[in-house]
C-alpha cells in the first residue's frame, strides 16, 4: 500500500515510529507537510500538489495534524477523502475533537461523565459562572490551548474572578471547569484504536503542578483500567467519530470523567510506559480497514 502521513515533523517520535512500522510491513510511505500542499478542487479529478507536482494516488492517509494548523490541515485531509483515500481518522472527527467546547457538548449529550463545565461571554456573568461549577478552586481553560498551555488553576474566588476578567478583556475564548481535587494531579490516558483500548497509562503531575501533561514534566506509568473506564474511553472516541484517540480521564468520586479527546495522541509516552508497539497496531488497523474501503468501492 502507498501511505501518506500528514505531519509537519518528520523527526518527531510518533511520525518516525509510524514510518518504521509501515516500512517493516512492506508499505511505501511518504511524510507530507500539509502546509506545503495546495489543492485543485474540481468535479472530475480533484488533486493535491506540492512543489509544482501532483502527489498522485495514495491508498491510505494517517493524519498527524498539529493543533495550530487544524484549519488548513483538515482541508488537505478532506481533499484526500474526496479523492477516495482511506483516512484512519476523518476530518470531521478531528474538527470535533479540536473544538474543546463542542466536544464537551457532544459528550454531554451522550451522557458521558464530564467535569461540570461553564461557558460565558460577559464579565457580568462571572459570579454565576463560578457558582455554576461549584466555586473555587476551579480550572480556567483557553479553548485554543494544547499540552497544558492556557490552563489555569484558580485556587480562590478572587483569583478566579481576576483570571476570568483578564481573559475576557483579551477577548479570549475560555471555559471554566470544576476542579477534581480527588484526582491528586493524576490523569489516565487511554489509547483507543477502533473498538478497543489497546494501551493505558497514568500520568502524574510533578510536585507543585496540577497539570499532568508529559510536556509539563509529568511522569507516566502503566495503569490497569476498570471496565467502566474502558467503556467511557470507547464511548468518548466513538462520539467524536475517531478511530484513533487519546482519551484523558480523571478518577473522580462520581466515576471517570473525560477531560479531553485527542485526535493525534503522541506515541512516545504510551509506548515507553506500556512497552506496547502502538505504531504497529495502528498500521495493522489501517491495513485491515483500508482494504475493506477499497473492496467496498469496487
UniProtKB/Swiss-Prot annotation:
Cofactor: Mg(2+); Mn(2+)
Manganese in keyword set: yes
Residues given in the record as Mn(2+) 2 binding sites: 260, 262
Binding site for Mg(2+) 1: 248, 260
GO terms under cellular component: cytoplasm
Domain ATP-grasp: 104-287
Alphabetical list of SUPFAM superfamilies matching this protein: Glutathione synthetase ATP-binding domain-like
Biological process terms in GO annotation: protein modification process; SOS response; translation
Binding positions for Mn(2+) 1 per the UniProt entry: 248, 260
GO molecular function, one term: metal ion binding
Binding site for Mg(2+) 2: 260, 262
E.C. code: 6.3.2.-
Keywords, in A-Z order: ATP-binding, Ligase, Magnesium, Manganese, Metal-binding, Nucleotide-binding, Protein biosynthesis
Cofactor, how bound (note): Binds 2 magnesium or manganese ions per subunit.
Any Pfam family matching the protein: Rimk_N
InterPro entries for the chain: ATP-grasp, ATP-grasp_RimK-type, ATP_grasp_subdomain_1, RimK, Rimk_N, Rp_bS6_RimK/Lys_biosynth_LsyX
Family in the record: Belongs to the RimK family.
The protein's name in its UniProt record: Probable alpha-L-glutamate ligase 2
The organism of origin for this protein: Shewanella frigidimarina (strain NCIMB 400)
Amino acid at each position: 500500500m502507498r501511505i501518506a502521513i500528514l505531519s509537519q515533523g518528520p523527526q518527531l517520535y510518533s511520525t518516525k515510529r509510524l514510518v518504521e512500522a509501515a516500512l517493516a510491513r512492506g508499505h511505501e510511505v511518504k511524510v507530507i507537510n500539509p502546509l506545503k500542499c495546495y489543492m485543485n478542487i474540481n468535479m472530475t479529478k480533484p488533486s493535491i500538489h506540492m512543489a509544482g507536482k501532483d502527489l498522485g494516488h495514495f491508498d491510505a492517509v494517517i493524519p498527524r495534524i498539529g493543533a495550530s494548523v487544524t484549519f488548513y490541515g483538515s482541508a488537505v485531509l478532506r481533499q484526500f477523502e474526496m479523492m477516495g483515500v482511506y483516512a484512519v481518522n476523518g476530518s470531521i472527527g478531528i474538527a470535533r475533537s479540536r473544538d474543546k467546547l463542542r466536544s464537551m457538548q457532544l459528550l454531554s449529550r451522550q451522557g458521558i461523565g464530564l467535569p461540570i463545565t461553564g461557558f460565558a461571554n460577559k464579565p457580568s456573568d462571572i459570579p454565576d459562572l463560578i457558582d455554576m461549577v461549584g466555586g473555587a478552586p476551579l480550572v480556567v481553560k483557553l479553548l485554543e490551548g494544547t499540552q497544558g498551555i492556557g490552563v489555569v488553576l484558580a485556587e480562590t474566588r478572587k483569583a478566579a474572578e481576576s483570571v476570568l476578567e483578564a481573559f475576557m478583556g483579551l477577548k479570549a475564548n475560555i471555559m471554566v471547569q470544576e476542579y477534581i481535587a480527588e484526582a491528586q494531579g493524576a490523569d489516565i490516558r487511554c489509547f483507543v484504536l477502533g473498538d478497543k483500548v489497546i494501551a493505558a497509562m497514568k500520568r502524574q503531575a510533578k510536585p507543585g503542578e496540577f497539570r499532568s501533561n508529559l510536556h509539563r514534566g509529568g511522569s507516566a506509568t502503566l495503569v490497569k483500567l476498570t471496565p467502566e473506564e474502558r467503556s467511557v474511553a470507547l464511548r468518548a472516541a466513538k462520539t467524536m467519530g475517531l478511530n484513533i484517540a487519546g482519551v484523558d480521564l480523571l478518577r473522580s468520586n462520581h466515576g471517570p470523567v473525560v477531560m479531553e479527546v485527542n485526535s493525534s495522541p503522541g506515541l512516545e509516552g504510551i509506548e515507553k510506559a506500556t512497552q506496547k508497539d502502538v505504531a504497529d497496531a495502528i498500521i495493522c488497523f489501517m491495513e485491515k480497514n483500508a482494504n475493506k474501503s477499497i473492496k467496498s468501492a469496487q
